[in-house]
């Protein structure tokens, strides 16, 4: 029996080569276990030993492992031994034995390589198959719940597989990296990815990115890592070029190309990319199809894979419906030599009747379906034919949940209704456009001229700025959107109070309502506060107001105090409340019953510290407070009355209340805010990201110097009428590494160029208004070097700037999106041709900078700045006394609002021209259907 037992079993003496004995531990560093008792193994205890004796079945080892088959059944001397020594990673070997005996083992990102290496070395096909299957599933599955492979582990797996495991492991690593590119490009180890692995990933058909710019960003991150872009040898330069040549430059947004034009890895391609995009913007869909060569037109096809969940095409005016169609057709479609003819037939007949159109599309266009796509952004893609787009999207993206189509003037309400009919699972739509500067109830107008279906699943609808939407159209939308939870109609000036009330009555699930700059008034409040009646013999005593979590009603006038009080007292669940520029009073705000408020805006109201303190004390989770322009915050007592809460409430006590909460993230304040207020606020300010201080506050230099240490996370600083100095500004700009916005308006004190000589690569927005009178062209050049990534710049009162600063701006900030220049010397004395280098401009404000702007500027600007939406000019700067206006019906236009100011031409007693005084403003508003011209007294 003993001899039989020796033949049947073998003792494996497994020693961990990496084991380090602890002198303080027991002298016994070996443990004996049996493979027959795997179920009772205590792995944590076993792994604490440096050596393990495992009693295993000889036959099973021979059958399951080619290594032990050769060792125990061949001619090796060990074949007759009952003890076999094995030097291997202890945990990996024990897991291998468990696999041999049919037990499940857990594979993780970190354990895969040791297990795979063990399986290869010991020749265990079962474990090899398990490892391969695990990696295959992760490389091909759409299940987001599956574990992730850490990038550092993936690199090691790929390198090992390349050397030892043939093709399948490297191929799966490449596939995994391609599928998860959006995730791994922000990984700290992304710079360690070998060139070959990255190149194979970029070329892989499953490369999944939200947009082409995400791919470029990833490549630039990789190139920047480890100083790859400095002193490159010729071979590395070739690698860089090879990588960047995989980018589809025709799909990049203009602002992105311009903004990256100074990046070392991208600069060689920037000019040709802009030239290509500009060429495509002028090319109709049918011409684009005609220009393509045989085979799949890779360079103009949007990257879409079975793993795509988000498609971001925003900011690409060069895209037309042909580009999208080419992207959702299979490669096999382009094998047919007649593919151009069938595609052109579809593009030329978008207005055919529905039945005929369906026949054409099904017969000639085998459109692919990408069921994983949940979100699409086509904002600022104004050349798209939305009839074609909707038909194709409805077939290709059946699971679409969110659609953002902002700043598109050619999308009508009828288009929206068609969207709702074609996308049954759509829950969120954003059709935002620029809010008109004309508020009918405020403007002093001289003259003005013109122009039952199934329910939708829409829960969020944004119509901000859609001044073309009237009562009838919003009612039509609400009839199919009864499940609305979020509605944004900010700036929809044509809507009546009665219409808004009707929508509220129909959409009983509303919990977020944005109605700023509308006619929202008495009727709407009655609808919000009315009891909701249900149909199934059930009465819900709650009102819509009682379920509201967000209500923004800035500049809504004509609301009585009684109605406002009724609304406030019903809003116990409110989280975000905006009462800016309303008639809200202390007595109304004090009745606010909520305790979950996270954001409160009472700017430009008569609210005092007393009422504010009452609200803050009841809402400890307040994260955003906006209270600029509240002059009553200076008063300690209101109307001589006392209150049960406190007869005298100071700002310091209010900020002490804030300090008891979870911490402020955003603060806008003015009257009554001082050094002592800030001291009281300091415990609550450590998480502050945004601070805006306006008229009536008195921070002083000391507070500015405290900002970096007190608020290290600050991203935005806006100061109006505050005392500043070089030392304070230097402290802020050198210490706040997250700062993205700096605005100094009408501040006093001495600052110089020294404050701006520090590197600020993260700064995106800079406003210097009446604070840098000394600025010269050379100073501006220094600013372009210190802040190379600015996208928004506003300069006011820089009297020494000349027209020579235009090329400085264009070359220094080619990706500029918003540019405001007012009373800046003679910048436009010789025209504005040198500004055309800022090709991505969307917002341009030029006023009192020199009378050299050509009469044709507006016409030229729409061509030179294809993304331009907002323009503000002044007749004082017109070279020929006026400006030509673009045609009313211009296809694919993005320009929506033009403001032209005129000044009085008064002269002083000595015959010299006096300082210009505003007289009137002509506002031209294109809403996608009509061009409206309005002449106002106000300066906008």
Curated annotation (Swiss-Prot):
Domain BACK: from-to ranges: 155-258
Pathway the protein contributes to: Protein modification; protein ubiquitination
Ubl conjugation in keyword set: no
A Pfam family this chain is assigned to: BTB
Keyword annotations from UniProtKB, A to Z: Ubl conjugation pathway
Matches recorded under InterPro entries: BACK, BTB/POZ_dom, Leu-rich_rpt_Cys-con_subtyp, LRR_dom_sf, SKP1/BTB/POZ_sf
PROSITE patterns: BTB
Domain BTB positions: 41-109
Superkingdom in the source lineage: Eukaryota
Classification via CDD domains: BTB_POZ_ZBTB_KLHL-like (cd18186)
One of the protein's GO biological processes: protein ubiquitination
SUPFAM superfamilies documented for this protein: POZ domain, RNI-like
RNA-binding in keyword set: no
Domain notes: The BTB/POZ domain mediates the interaction with some component of ubiquitin ligase complexes.
Function text: May act as a substrate-specific adapter of an E3 ubiquitin-protein ligase complex (CUL3-RBX1-BTB) which mediates the ubiquitination and subsequent proteasomal degradation of target proteins.
Protein name: BTB/POZ domain-containing protein FBL11
Native organism: Arabidopsis thaliana
């Amino acid at each position: 029996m003993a001899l039989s037992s020796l033949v049947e079993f073998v003792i494996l003496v497994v020693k961990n080569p990496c084991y380090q004995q602890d002198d303080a531990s027991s002298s016994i560093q070996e443990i004996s276990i049996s493979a027959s008792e795997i179920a009772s193994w205590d792995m944590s205890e076993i792994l604490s030993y440096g050596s393990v004796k495992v009693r295993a079945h000889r036959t099973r080892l021979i059958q399951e492992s080619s290594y032990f088959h050769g060792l125990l059944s061949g001619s090796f001397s060990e074949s007759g031994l009952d003890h076999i020594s094995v030097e291997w990673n202890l945990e990996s070997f024990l897991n291998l034995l468990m696999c041999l005996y049919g037990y499940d083992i857990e594979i993780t990102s970190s354990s895969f390589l040791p297990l795979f290496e063990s399986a290869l070395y010991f020749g265990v096909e079962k474990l090899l198959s398990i490892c391969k299957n695990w990696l295959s599933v992760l490389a091909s599955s759409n299940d987001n719940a599956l574990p992730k492979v850490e990038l550092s582990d993936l690199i090691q797996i790929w390198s090992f597989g390349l050397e030892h495991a043939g093709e399948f492991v490297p191929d799966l690593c490449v596939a995994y990296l391609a599928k998860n590119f959006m995730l791994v490009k922000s990984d700290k180890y992304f710079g360690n990815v070998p060139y070959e692995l990255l190149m194979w990933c970029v070329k892989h058909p499953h490369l999944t990115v939200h947009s082409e710019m995400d791919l470029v960003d990833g490549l630039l991150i990789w190139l920047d890592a480890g100083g790859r872009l400095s002193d490159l040898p010729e071979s590395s330069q070739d690698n860089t070029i090879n990588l960047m040549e995989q980018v589809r430059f025709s799909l990049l947004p203009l602002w992105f190309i311009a903004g990256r034009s100074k990046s070392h890895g991208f600069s060689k391609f920037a000019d040709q990319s802009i030239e290509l995009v500009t060429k495509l913007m002028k090319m109709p869909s049918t011409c684009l199809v005609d220009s393509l060569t045989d085979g799949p037109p890779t360079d103009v096809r949007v990257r879409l894979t079975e793993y795509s969940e988000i498609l971001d095409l925003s900011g690409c005016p060069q895209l037309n419906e042909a580009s999208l169609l080419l992207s959702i057709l299979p490669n096999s479609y382009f094998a047919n030599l007649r593919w151009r003819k069938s595609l052109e037939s579809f593009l030329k007949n978008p207005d055919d009747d529905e039945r005929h159109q369906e026949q054409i599309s099904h017969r000639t266009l085998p459109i692919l379906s990408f069921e994983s796509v949940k979100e699409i952004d086509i904002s600022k893609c104004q050349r798209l034919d939305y009839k074609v787009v909707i038909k194709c999207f409805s077939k290709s993206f059946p699971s679409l949940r969110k659609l953002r189509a902002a700043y598109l003037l050619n999308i009508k309400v009828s288009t929206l209704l068609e969207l709702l009919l074609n996308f049954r699972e759509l829950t969120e739509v954003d059709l935002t456009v620029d809010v008109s500067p004309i508020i009918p109830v405020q403007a002093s107008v001289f003259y003005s001229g013109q122009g039952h279906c199934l329910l939708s699943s829409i829960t969020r609808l944004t119509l901000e700025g859609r001044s073309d939407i009237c009562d009838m159209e919003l009612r039509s939308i609400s009839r199919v959107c009864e499940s609305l939870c979020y509605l944004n109609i900010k700036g929809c000036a044509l809507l009546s109070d009665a219409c808004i009330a009707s929508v509220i009555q129909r959409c009983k699930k509303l919990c977020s309502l944005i109605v700023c700059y509308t006619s929202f008034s008495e009727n709407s409040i009655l609808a919000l506060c009315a009891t909701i009646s249900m149909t199934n013999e059930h009465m819900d005593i709650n009102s819509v107001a009682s379920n509201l979590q967000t209500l923004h009603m800035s500049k809504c006038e004509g609301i009585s105090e009684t109605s406002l009080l009724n609304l406030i007292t019903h809003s116990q669940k409110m989280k975000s409340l905006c009462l800016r520029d309303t008639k809200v009073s202390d007595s109304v705000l004090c009745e606010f019953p909520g305790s979950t408020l996270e954001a409160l805006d009472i700017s430009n109201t008569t609210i005092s510290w007393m009422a504010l303190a009452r609200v803050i004390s009841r809402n400890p989770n307040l994260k955003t407070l906006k209270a600029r322009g509240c002059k009553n915050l200076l008063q300690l007592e209101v109307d001589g009355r006392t209150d049960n809460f406190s007869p005298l409430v100071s700002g310091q006590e209010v900020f002490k209340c804030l300090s008891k909460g979870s911490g402020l993230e955003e603060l806008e304040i003015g009257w009554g805010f001082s050094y002592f207020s800030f001291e009281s606020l300091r415990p609550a300010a450590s998480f502050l990201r945004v601070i805006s201080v306006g008229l009536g506050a008195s921070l002083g230099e000391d507070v500015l110097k405290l900002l970096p240490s007190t608020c290290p996370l600050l991203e935005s600083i806006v100061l109006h009428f505050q005392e500043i100095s070089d030392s304070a500004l230097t402290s802020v700009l050198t210490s706040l590494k997250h700062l993205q916005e700096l605005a100094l308006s009408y501040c006093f004190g001495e600052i110089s160029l020294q404050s701006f000589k520090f590197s600020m690569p993260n700064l995106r927005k800079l406003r210097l208004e009446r604070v840098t009178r000394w600025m010269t062209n050379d100073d501006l050049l220094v600013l372009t070097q210190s802040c190379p990534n600015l996208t928004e710049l506003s300069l006011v009162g820089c009297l020494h700037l000349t027209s020579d600063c235009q090329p400085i701006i264009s070359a220094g900030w080619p990706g500029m999106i918003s540019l405001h220049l007012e009373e800046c010397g003679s910048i436009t004395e010789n025209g504005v041709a040198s500004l055309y280098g800022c090709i991505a401009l969307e917002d341009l404000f030029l006023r009192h900078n020199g009378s050299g702007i050509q009469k044709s500027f507006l016409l030229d600007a729409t061509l030179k700045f294809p993304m331009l939406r907002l323009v503000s000019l002044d007749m004082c700067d017109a070279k020929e006394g006026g400006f030509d206006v673009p045609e009313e019906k211009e296809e694919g236009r993005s320009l929506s609002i033009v403001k032209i100011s005129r000044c009085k031409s008064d002269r002083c007693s000595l015959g010299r021209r006096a300082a210009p005084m505003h007289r009137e403003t002509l506002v031209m508003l294109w809403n996608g259907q009509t061009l409206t011209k309005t002449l106002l007294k106000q300066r906008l």
